[in-house]
Amino acid sequence: MLLAIDVRNTHTVVGLISGSGDHAKVEQHWRIRTEPEVTADELALTIDGLIGDDAERLTGAAGLSTVPSVLHEVRVMLDQYWPSVPHVLIEPGVRTGIPLLVDNPKEVGADRIVNCLAAYHKFGTASIVVDFGSSICVDVVSAKGEFLGGAIAPGVQVSSDAAAERSAALRRVELTRPRSVVGKNTVECMQAGAVFGFAGLVDGLVSRVRDDVDGFGGGDVNVVATGHGAPLVLADLRTVEHYDRHLTLDGLRLVFERNRDSQRGKLKQAR
């Protein structure tokens, strides 16, 4: 059983994956709040409480974090609480198998890398990955499996909250799909702007990639959405063909397997 840990700016997803290769399956997953000041001990208590008896069945662990301080605590946690479980954390120097054709590869978020790796492995074609998190990342992977770059926009919830915070006449609203693009009250107006506005933003970015990037204008390009915020706008997206809620967890598994296999089945054990 592989323990997969996906730490983002606001929330963390913990998953348990059974099997490997084409037989891999996400058996369970949980979403918890990310605390930037969390300690390794606190992480261990939380994760051990979630996975229960499966802690004794772990054969590996893979993790990423967009919060550097938490990545350090994840490493310490694995070293101290699961010292016999081989692990890999996505950071510079780790073999991911996806070339980063950008100005500064060290700037590329680990989440973006594993998403594109998983999409290329899933489809085997040029792909566009749209990850709906605290930011919306539209990332591009070539037909050769190369990360070409992408675009980053503020996330739906972040933008809606910022509008409410900076305007005396607006308030924070629950983000659900409104009955019409033409809102009849302030809440519906904000919901319409968030849902339909960001659907248009994503469709616009995907269409521009198709128009402007060589090799992306044909029908052999797959567009996949992932992330906790994706279901909010999926029905209104005209350019996205696929949705994979576990794309990032699958990418973590692929990186773990690549590093395990490259070392004849043995990753460096936790210290």
Swiss-Prot record:
Its EC number is 2.7.1.33. GO terms for cellular component: cytoplasm. One of its GO terms (biological process) is coenzyme A biosynthetic process. The keyword Hydrolase does not apply. Its main location: cytoplasm. The keyword Transferase applies. Belongs to the type III pantothenate kinase family. A monovalent cation. Ammonium or potassium. This is Type III pantothenate kinase. It is found in: Cytoplasm.
